[in-house]
Amino acid sequence: KEKLDVPIKLQEVDAYNGFAKKVFIKLNEKVEMINITCFGKKVGFDRTNSGIRVFFSVPYKHKEKTYKCFLETKSYSKREILVIHVKKYPYQEEFLKVPKKHVDLATKDIERWKKEVLELKKVYEASILKRALFTEPFARPLPSKITSSYGKRRVFNNKKDSWHSGVDFRARTPTEIPSSNRGKIAFTGHLFFNGNTVIIDHGLGIFTMYCHLSKINALVGEIVPKGAIVGISGNTGRSNAPHLHWGVKVAENWINGLSLIKQGI
């Protein structure tokens, strides 16, 4: 079993709701590692020469408050290793017009959506947590204009209220859509809201999602390099114009993918 050290000094960091963060923790006491949990969820981590890198994310709906991360080991049931001071990010709002069928859902559509939620839950539960499949930093999928930013409160047809869990890029059809980093294709298929979708597992609890595609160019289980063309842009699912919805999930939370890139993760 892998042995790592437990830190002496408790670290403290600031983080916005909806953002991901990488923290290096220096260790100095040999123990058998099991898990690291933040916000009650297991988070990704890997080993370096003098410690571990922890990859956590702050849930979008979390309020300004102080939270703690814990290390679980064979020697200690739980030990505090990190204190996170959550700060509220000033997200915007927008009003969108989409086909009525995507707002006032028929019973069959609700049942379909519920099945999709369960299917994707299994995909995310199979996440690779303690190993990275990538060696380079993540990159924006497209250099084009961002048409809708992460975290916006979204009102559909003046009645359906939600929030935007990804970043939308302008992508006229047919624009080739590249992967943001190396990883394993975890899902391909047509989803009610997201249309034709590709999901990549990058390890360390990090997933990227590419939605509304007109064509999928990937197979579940294959390892794709950074920049591999996984699909062609489109207007499938709940969409009012051709574009790419790019979603990033870290430690089970949909986060602002640009925060991942900004830190060089």
Q: What does each model-identified segment do?
A:
Residues K1-P90:
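Cationic-aromatic interfacial patches
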Residues G40, C69, I146, F169, ...:
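Terminal peptide-recognition signature
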Residues P59-K61, K74, P174, H190-L191, ...:
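Short polar/acidic secondary-structure junctions
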Residues V83-N194:
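Surface-exposed, glycine-biased beta-strand/turn segments
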Residues K97-H102, K249-I265:
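Short peripheral tails and domain-boundary helices/loops at the edges of structured domains
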Residues F134, A186-F192, A228-P242:
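Flexible, gly/ser-rich surface segments that form the specificity/activation loops bordering the active-site cleft
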Residues E176-F187, K215-S233:
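Short, well-structured beta-strand-loop connectors
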Residues S180-S214, P242-G247:
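Zn2+-dependent peptidoglycan hydrolase active-site motif and core
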